[in-house]
């Protein structure tokens, strides 16, 4: 008998951080839908303003608060839910659930945990309890011992024997974990590992060098019925975090006995923790024989369960929520197929490849080797009918400038076999590119296996691609059969044209003449073995006919955001989903093209049609040929859509909204600067970096510092502030590399200015705009800035000038749809620095802060015009809203934390308040590891910028009850100083509660900043923000905990 609680509290995962990303927007949204179907009132706690689930249509009540136990207790006290779901918000939600249980909050208010119970969660997440549980149930685990202190860890490592793997309990993304080859390795890093455990516990485990890592996803109901949904094979061996691994599904190298044995163990693991819902079980398999160990389990929706859901077409999160309510597997219908129940295990007639995406080039000093800690910020998923096709598609989806496994920059680089093997031994990201290069330079399968541990099955497939490509290069013309084979192996028109030394248009023309076009296949979860109809599709050249007939009519294709990276995250998925919903009123059929397995936009019940495939000109033109889309929308998915807009328009594609030529003017720095000059709109002095002589002349006129800005980039890629000639020439070189087709502009950097933005919508004549003000001064990338609505420090006169400028641009460029304009304001004069003719990163925040969906308004603007009489309209603010960045410094081994014009944050949180400080503090506390300092603790405050703000910060922290030290080498007037060595010792001893600093001081304070983030100590990297947060600490007792609509926000 199922349970029907009247009101359920769902805990979200908070802002996106490395290892806890948009997969929890997807899983949380599905859980909320499953509850709504039952007529259950839902309450959501989540501070991630960028997500789809923090829109009003998903939860009946929404609290945008820090996802921590004391804030959730306030919600429980007010809402009195019957049940709580903690399995849909990642490790963050599980930790909160365990805390609420241990502190007696759930018992006090009679709140029942739905799904897997707390004792089962603790058995799974405490390394010690998990080991004991497996041994009790005769399930194989590697030799290991747990430890709760440095001394115990060192002692147990001697017993287990080196090399050892250090695994961290109650932890996210392998943070703090490592492989220690010697006692010296262990001593150097064990304190950090213990610091990263929520319960101060690690497991010292025998390191299984070059063993194969596999994952199984299992569903289990309250009666113990189980269904194994997917087997996922990691191409990277043990020692590389699964989130860092390239993976395939279904498993490719297992024989039936291996598969069935591990399947049985998976069901036994689920039984041993009394799982209700979904979990994944990770295995290590000896490549030399039938020997396997169970490594761990996650008793919640996870990154791999989101991948499994999208790979198989089985809605794991939806089914899991139903099981948590007491349904049995046979009682739940799989809504993807619409025909089968949830006890049917999926069968695949295709191969899925997932590859992580890294952005390590944005971070100084970062360790470039893949290891036990996750550092990737996103992932892509491709679908093909052969491993080669699937892998090559996935490489292009990464959007890193590589056309496939072969034929790109790395493949054609000057690099010897020895160098390629060296990079492989170091486990550099995108290892498959170096594997191909090694084979091209003459390496053998055995040589590559020796340094990588990657199965020879996969290495042989990559070698086959190299051999085929080298054969292509000696052809003068290509015949029909060879071209067909190339497409079946996943080669793009670009790759083929490079090999033949022809144009892509030439290859496409031959394909069209020979009728070599991809076919559309359905993902039905059952490999066609059972009748079902789905809307979930991919394209392949390994087929003869389409699985569906294409209708005629008024149809729209929406280009999604692709794989997430620094600067492109869940906020663009919010824009895509918002556009899907808004566009359905104007079109007969709306389809989306996207390939990100983490997102809501790639869910089975969001779009009328979902094409899970590449985003590039070739693929969009293929789809238009089949579907005859009337329009293509490129403005909602971030930079990837804008990058192909002009080329699509040149190929006769009708773009929805602003024209591709206007987008080109805005994205091309030189063209845009000339336009501003023509319109008489103020901007920082600039010059196009066409020659060193021009640059020298310009710098002599305006003086340092100057800002180097490439075109057609997102998140400030290669954008740098240069303070000397040496820096300037180095930055120009890098910027030219990242955007070689477009000009680099050098502009005067205006110091000590306010940065502000306008998120807006235009119909070409009028503007709906929302003003956002940054807390940090100009020079900190907008994605890393703390933002306030309404504005606080800008004068009305400045804002009016900004509005005039925006209106002038909207009319000149005939902007139709969403846009974002960035300003630097100095001495009440606004200077425009950037215009983005697309949905912006801050648009979910500005929309929810004002209670008006800017994407919905965009569709009105495009088709009907804006419905107000003023030339420029800004909705009034009812209360305060503040958005804060989430950094993942601790996950990025070795990097130096600092802020500048290139974006570093991985996510964002927001909160609402009756005052600016009420909203600010809750927003800041929503980003980990931020917390209220313990009074009587120590704060370090120092820096070489914003010194007045730093001094005032120190005064506030003293008032709050902290002992504040500055550093004698960088003293602050009136503040007690200690030397740098003493400061480092205090941080290492974990006696420091918070660090507030400013400026780029890597040679001086690298150890202080790095150790602080490694030990989970809050670090504020800007003096102005430090001052505002320290002031907010003084009003900590005045925080408000209202539902979002009580603040007048939400959409």
Swiss-Prot record:
The taxonomic lineage of its organism, from the top, reads: Archaea, Thermoproteota, Thermoprotei, Sulfolobales, Sulfolobaceae
Q: Which residues bind Mn(2+) 1?
A: 282, 296
For this entry, the protein name equals Carbamoyl phosphate synthase large chain
Q: Where does Mg(2+) 4 bind?
A: 834, 836
Q: Name one GO molecular function term.
A: metal ion binding
Q: Where is the MGS-like domain?
A: 930-1051
Q: Which organism is it from?
A: Saccharolobus islandicus (strain M.14.25 / Kamchatka #1) (Sulfolobus islandicus)
Residues engaged in binding Mg(2+) 3: 822, 834
What does the entry's domain section say? The large subunit is composed of 2 ATP-grasp domains that are involved in binding the 2 ATP molecules needed for carbamoyl phosphate synthesis. The N-terminal ATP-grasp domain (referred to as the carboxyphosphate synthetic component) catalyzes the ATP-dependent phosphorylation of hydrogencarbonate to carboxyphosphate and the subsequent nucleophilic attack by ammonia to form a carbamate intermediate.
| Gene name, Swiss-Prot/TrEMBL | carB
């Amino acid at each position: 008998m199922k349970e029907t609680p009247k009101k359920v509290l769902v805990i979200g995962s908070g802002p996106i951080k490395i290892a806890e990303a948009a997969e929890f927007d997807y899983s949380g949204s599905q859980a909320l839908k499953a509850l709504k179907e039952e007529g259950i009132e839902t309450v959501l706690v989540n501070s991630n303003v960028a997500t789809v689930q923090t829109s009003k249509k998903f939860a009946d009540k929404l609290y945008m608060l820090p996802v921590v136990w004391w804030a959730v207790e306030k919600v429980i006290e007010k809402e009195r839910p019957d049940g709580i779901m903690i399995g849909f918000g990642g490790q963050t939600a599980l930790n909160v659930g365990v805390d609420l249980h241990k502190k007696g909050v759930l018992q006090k208010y009679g709140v029942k945990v739905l799904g897997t119970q707390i004792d089962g969660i603790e058995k799974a997440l405490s390394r010690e309890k998990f080991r004991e549980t497996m041994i009790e149930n005769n399930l194989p685990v590697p030799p290991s011992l747990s430890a709760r202190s440095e001394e115990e860890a060192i002692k147990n490592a001697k017993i287990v024997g080196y090399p050892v793997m250090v695994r961290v309990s109650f932890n996210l993304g392998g943070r703090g974990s490592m492989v220690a080859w010697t006692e010296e390795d262990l001593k150097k890093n064990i304190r950090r590992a213990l610091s990263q455990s929520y319960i101060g516990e690690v497991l010292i485990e025998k390191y299984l060098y070059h063993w194969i890592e596999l994952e199984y996803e299992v569903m289990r109901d309250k009666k113990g019925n189980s269904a194994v949904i997917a087997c996922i094979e990691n191409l990277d061996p043990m020692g590389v975090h699964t989130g860092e691994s390239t993976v395939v599904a279904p498993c490719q190298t297992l024989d039936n006995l291996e598969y069935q044995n591990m399947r049985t163990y998976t069901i036994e693991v689920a039984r041993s923790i009394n799982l209700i819902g979904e979990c994944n079980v990770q295995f290590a398999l000896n490549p030399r024989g039938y020997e396997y160990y169970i490594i761990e389990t996650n008793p919640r929706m996870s990154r791999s369960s989101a991948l499994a859901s999208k790979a198989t077409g089985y809605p794991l999160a939806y089914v899991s929520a139903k099981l948590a309510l007491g349904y049995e597997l046979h009682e739940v219908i799989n809504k993807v197929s619409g025909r089968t129940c949830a006890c049917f295990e999926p069968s695949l007639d295709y191969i899925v490849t997932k590859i992580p995406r890294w952005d390590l080039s944005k971070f100084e000093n970062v360790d470039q080797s893949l290891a036990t800690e996750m550092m990737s910020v996103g992932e892509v998923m491709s679908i093909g009918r052969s491993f080669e096709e699937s892998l090559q598609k996935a490489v292009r989806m990464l959007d890193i400038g590589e056309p496939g496994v072969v034929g790109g920059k790395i493949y054609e680089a000057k690099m010897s076999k020895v160098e390629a093997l060296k990079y492989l031994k170091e486990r550099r990201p995108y290892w498959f590119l170096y594997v191909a290069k090694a084979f091209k330079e003459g390496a053998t399968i055995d040589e590559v296996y020796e340094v990588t541990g990657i199965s020879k099955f996969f290495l042989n497939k990559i070698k086959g691609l190299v051999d085929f490509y080298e054969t292509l290069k000696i052809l003068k013309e290509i015949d029909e059969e060879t071209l067909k084979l190339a497409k079946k192996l996943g080669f793009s028109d670009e790759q083929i044209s490079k090999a033949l030394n022809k144009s892509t248009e030439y290859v496409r023309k031959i394909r069209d003449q020979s009728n070599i076009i991809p076919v559309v296949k359905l993902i039905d979860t059952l490999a066609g073995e059972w009748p079902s109809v789905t809307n979930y599709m991919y394209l392949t050249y390994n087929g003869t006919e389409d699985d569906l007939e294409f209708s005629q009519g008024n149809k729209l294709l929406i280009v999604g955001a692709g794989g997430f990276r620094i600067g492109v995250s869940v906020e663009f998925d919010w824009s895509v989903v918002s556009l899907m919903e808004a566009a359905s009123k104007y079109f007969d059929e709306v389809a989306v093209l996207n390939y990100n397995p983490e997102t809501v936009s790639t869910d089975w019940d969001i779009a009328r049609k979902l094409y899970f495939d590449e985003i590039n000109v070739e693929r969009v033109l293929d789809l238009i040929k089949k579907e005859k889309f009337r329009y293509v929308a490129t403005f909602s998915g971030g930079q990837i859509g804008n990058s192909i807009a002009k080329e699509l328009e040149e190929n006769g594609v009708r773009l929805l909204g602003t024209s591709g030529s206007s987008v080109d003017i805005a994205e091309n720095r030189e063209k845009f600067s000339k336009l501003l000059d023509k319109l008489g709109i103020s901007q920082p002095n600039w010059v196009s970096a066409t020659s060193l002589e021009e640059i020298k002349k310009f710098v002599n006129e305006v003086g340092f510092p100057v800002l180097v800005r490439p075109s057609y980039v997102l998140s400030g890629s290669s954008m740098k502030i240069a303070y000397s000639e040496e820096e300037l020439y180095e930055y120009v070189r890098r910027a030219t590399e990242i955007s070689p087709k477009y000009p680099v502009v050098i502009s005067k950097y205006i110091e000590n200015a306010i940065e502000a933005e306008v998120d807006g919508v235009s119909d070409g004549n009028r503007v709906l705009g929302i003003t956002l003000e940054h807390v940090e001064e100009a020079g900190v990338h907008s994605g890393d800035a703390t933002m306030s609505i309404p504005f606080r420090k800008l004068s009305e006169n400045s804002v009016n000038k900004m509005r005039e400028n925006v209106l002038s641009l909207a009319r000149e460029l005939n902007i139709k749809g969403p846009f974002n304009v960035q300003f630097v304001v100095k001495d009440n004069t606004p200077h425009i620095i950037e215009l983005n003719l697309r949905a912006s990163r801050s648009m979910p925040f500005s929309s929810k802060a004002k209670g008006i969906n800017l994407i919905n308004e965009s569709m009105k603007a495009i088709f009907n015009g804006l419905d107000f009489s003023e030339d420029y309209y800004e909705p009034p603010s009812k209360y305060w809203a503040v958005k804060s960045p989430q950094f993942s410094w601790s996950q990025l081994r070795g990097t130096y934390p600092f802020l500048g014009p290139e974006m570093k944050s991985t996510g964002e949180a927001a909160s609402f308040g009756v005052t600016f400080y009420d909203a600010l503090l809750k927003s800041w506390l929503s980003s980990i590891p931020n917390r209220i300092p313990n009074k009587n603790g120590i704060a370090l405050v120092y820096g070489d910028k914003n010194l007045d703000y730093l001094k005032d910060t120190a005064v506030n922290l003293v008032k709050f009850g902290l002992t504040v030290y500055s550093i004698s080498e960088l003293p602050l007037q009136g503040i007690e100083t200690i030397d740098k060595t003493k400061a480092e010792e205090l941080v290492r001893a974990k006696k420091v509660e918070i660090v507030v600093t400013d400026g780029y001081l890597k040679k001086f304070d690298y150890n202080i900043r790095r150790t602080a983030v490694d030990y989970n100590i809050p670090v504020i990297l800007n003096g102005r923000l430090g001052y505002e947060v320290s002031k907010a600490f003084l009003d900590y007792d005045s925080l408000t905990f209202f539902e979002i609509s009580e603040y007048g926000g939400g959409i």
